[in-house]
Amino acid sequence: MMLRSQAKNVDLTSQADSRHQQKRKQAEQLDALKNPSEPAAKKQHSKGLTELRAHISGFKIDSAKRDPLGKSRTSRRDVENLPPQKSRYVDPCPHYDYDLEEAGNPDSISDYAQGIFDYYRHREVHFRVRKYLHKHPEVDVKTRAILIDWMVEIQETFELNHETLYNAVKLTDMYLCKTKNVDKNTIQKLACVAIFIAAKYDERSPPLVDDLIYLSGDRFSRDELLAMERELFATVGYDLGSPLSYRYLRRFGRVCRVDMKTLTMGRFILETSLMVYEYAMVSQSRLAAAAFVLAMRMLDKNNEYEWNPVLEKYSGFTGEEVMPLVEHMNHILHFSKDKWAQLTSVRQKYSHEVFFHVASIPMLPDTLKVVDSHTYAPVPMLSYP
């Protein structure tokens, strides 16, 4: 029989061995933390996996083909929708700030006004129209001018906003720019649809479809008009918020604090310019700036109004970038009166008392007159915008 003392010694020895094993295990764990190593594979890799690992480990990246660090890939649409970036800019008229002076006027939204028009200018390139008549054999410069004259008549008939007219013309040009072989039977339907869409975009009560069909002489049915509406929407990408020269002109009139007669004269010049095919390729902001300067000159007693720092500040153009277009717009006023005498909608509209009879104000001498010609002088080469 084992004695109690012997049993006690055995128990103590067992406890000592247990403590020793525990300390050794703790030491091994501590050593593993200090010197970590990859655990051995439980089984040998297959031949295919071994070859794959060898290929991956030997793969090298060509730094010449790799994008620079920190450079993200952006699509064209992403670039078009980026806000305008501020560049080095020297204020040509630092002593005058129209928006600061209008800070107390809630109608002027002076905190945002300049930013809005900066964004408009940034977006102009997105709605750029390029030459398209070569793609439509049945449509020429005169046909387009007749169409725009008729659209002005429709705008007056329904008493639509001016923005609706300008937007409708822009939609028409954008559609023709992106399509081919539009015939004369389709182009009037296109104009009706453009007015219909622009009115739904800008008016409280757009014209009825049946009224548009009636004014077009019942040349197409209701279903045909609605089908054309869907086609125009798809062609322009459902993008209707085009910057308009009419809005730029109103902005220039405000910052220069001109009277309503001067602003109306500018509108008459701009609406006349809508009939000129080549002007569809000119930026809306430049057209507005040129029309504004020409209006100021026509109403100035000495016809000596010049480009000034205020206009440069708020239009973004220098005088050299605008004055050639001013001269050509004056030529167009003469040409439209002499050669397009049957296109009377714009001139009759601005002969009314409500528009200060501005259409009857004497024009400046035409320095670009083309003798015995049925076409106007070439439009000067202009950058965009």
Curated annotation (Swiss-Prot):
Gene3D superfamilies recorded: Cyclin-like (1.10.472.10)
Lineage top rank: taxon: Eukaryota
CDD domains for this protein: CYCLIN_CCNB3_rpt1, CYCLIN_CCNB3_rpt2
Subcellular compartments: Nucleus
Keyword Repeat tagged: no
Gene deletion effect: RNAi-mediated knockdown causes a longer meiosis II in 1-cell embryos without affecting meiotic exit timing. In a pam-1 (or282) mutant background, restores normal timing for meiotic exit.
GO MF, one annotated term: cyclin-dependent protein serine/threonine kinase regulator activity
Chain intervals for the UniProt region annotation (Disordered): 1-48, 63-88
Basic and acidic residues: bias regions: 17-28, 63-80
SUPFAM superfamilies for this protein: Cyclin-like (SSF47954)
Keywords, alphabetical: Cell cycle, Cell division, Cyclin, Meiosis, Mitosis, Nucleus
GO process annotations (BP): cell division; centrosome cycle; G1/S transition of mitotic cell cycle; kinetochore organization; meiotic cell cycle; meiotic sister chromatid segregation; mitotic cell cycle; mitotic sister chromatid segregation
GO annotations of cellular component type: cyclin-dependent protein kinase holoenzyme complex; cytoplasm; nucleus
Xref: Pfam families: Cyclin_C, Cyclin_N
Biased composition (Polar residues): 1-16
Its job: Could be involved at the G2/M (mitosis) transition. Interacts with the CDK1 and CDK2 protein kinases. G2/M cyclins accumulate steadily during G2 and are abruptly destroyed at mitosis. Plays a role during oocyte meiosis II.
PANTHER family linked to this entry: CYCLINS
Family: Belongs to the cyclin family. Cyclin AB subfamily.
UniProt-recorded name of the protein: G2/mitotic-specific cyclin-B3
Organism from which the protein derives: Caenorhabditis elegans
Gene: cyb-3
